[in-house]
Every structure is written in C-alpha cells, then in structure tokens.
Amino acid sequence: MIDIKSFNEYPDIDKPRRLRKYVLIWCSKGTLKVMVDETELKLKEHEVLTITSGQIHYLKNYRKAEGCILEFTVDFFCKNDNDIELIFHNGLFCHFDLNEVIKIPNHGVVQTQLELIKKELLLKPYQHYISIHSRIELILVEINRAKVERGDEIWKPDALFLKFIETVRANFNKNYSLEQVARKLGTTEAKLNEQSKLHTGRTAQNVIYGLIASEAKRLLIYQNYSVKEVAYQLGFNDPFYFSNFFKKHAGISPKSYQSKYAL
C-alpha cells in the first residue's frame, strides 16, 4: 500500500523492477542514475523523479548518493477525484513515459515530509495513514510549485481522463476497445474523445494505442518473451498484426527493437 526506504535499504534496487505503485525517487545528496523503461536519467542533490505505476525502473551509480524512494498505490492515495487530479497535476505521474527530473528549490519541505512519513510508518501512531496522506499531498504541492516556478505550463487534467488512462493500463491483456473502456467508466466514447483532445491533442483511440505501444516496449526489453508472446500478452490474436501495429507506432519492428534494447 505504501512504503519508504533509503537507497541502501532496498534489496536489488539495481535490478529492473516493476511495481503497480506510484514511485517517487528523492536525491538528498550526491548523484545517481535511474533507468526508467529505456531512458536513463541523472538525479543530483535536491532533485526528484516520479515514476508511473507499471514503469520498469532501477538505480545505477547510487552507492555514494543519499536519498529515498517513496511508493504508494493508487488505492491508498486516491480517495476522491481531487486526489486523482493532484497526483497527476502537471504530469507528475501522468507523463506518457516522458519522465523528467525536477529540481526543488524549497527542498527542506520535501526532505522533512519524507522523514516524517518514514517515522509515521515506523511508529504507527493513531491515524498515521491519514497523516501520511496529508504529507504526500504537501510533497506533491511543493513539486508542482517547483515546476510552475521554472516556467512549466500548468496542466490539470480532469479525473475522468485519468481514470480512462488507468483503466487502459490495468487491462492491457484484454485489449479493450474504446467502447468497452467507456462502458466500464460509465461514460461515452464522445466524452473520452473530448477529454483526450483537450489534454493531449489526440483522440482517445490514439491515446490507447500510445499506451499499448509503451507497454509493448517494456515487455520486449525486460521480459524474456518472444514477439509472439508479447502480442498475446497485449491481447492481440494475430502476431503479424501486432508487428505491424508496433512498427507503425515505434518506427521499428518489434524484433529489431528487442535486439537493440533488450538487457
């Protein structure tokens, strides 16, 4: 549900891992590198990186760095639509795999709240989960302020759009059509298209295609699957159709992509 550990407390943090949690990596001292899917990012002192649920990641060159990793599930944090919108505000955990390193000028706030979260989890005082939820809110607000201060455009998607993305991510193997996703969310295809165009400039169907292509890349890089197995994992009945789909969206065949990037 929620956990926080310093870098040296995590076993095998230098091995690729995938969590159905939202991950926040905080560097308080030194430097380290983080691989997220196929992208390498460098964190320096007082910088933070957010990783969306399902993204594969691991640390590199972190032995001399200090910091911690906070992980929490969507069920723990998102009690209402306001929580959903905060967690994805300004692309914090909804960046379509364009992870970014964020420098925090007012770093003392983040450092203090992370330390207090760790203390709450250790001692478990009365209503500690409520306290932790509030402290995560403070951290996310501080990160949002840092992004605004550096000139980033404010991006605040509607909760429905975020539920749409999460539904697709949670059901890759079912290969839901847009109609099926809309039905699960109790809305319409037209409404999802409206939200998708508003927040991404793309149709809802193209958002789905993009999410599937990103998931295919993860499976090709980090899992010991053949192209055929990846196709079936993503709900494609025809591996040839999957190969054409992947090449259209990635600009390279799945076999070539796997040969180029696989560990």
Q: Where do the model's predicted regions map?
A:
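Short beta-strand His + acidic residue motifs that chelate non-heme Fe in jelly-roll/DSBH
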Residues: 33-35, 51, 56-63
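Short hydrophobic/aromatic patch on the recognition helix
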Residues: 46, 192-193, 241-242, 246
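Short, Lys/Arg-enriched, Trp-marked, Pro/Gly-tolerant hinge/linker segments that flank
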Residues: 100-103, 123-131, 141-185, 198-210
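Terminal helix-turn-helix DNA-binding modules in bacterial transcription factors
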Residues: 198-240, 256-263
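Generic protein-terminus/edge-of-domain signal
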Residues: 1-44
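Short coil turns linking two alpha-helices in DNA-binding domains
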Residues: 185-188, 237-238
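Flexible coil/turn residues that form the inter-helical turn or adjacent wing/linker of helix-turn-helix
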Residues: 39, 174, 223-224
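A hydrophobic/aromatic-rich effector-binding and dimerization subdomain
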Residues: 62-119
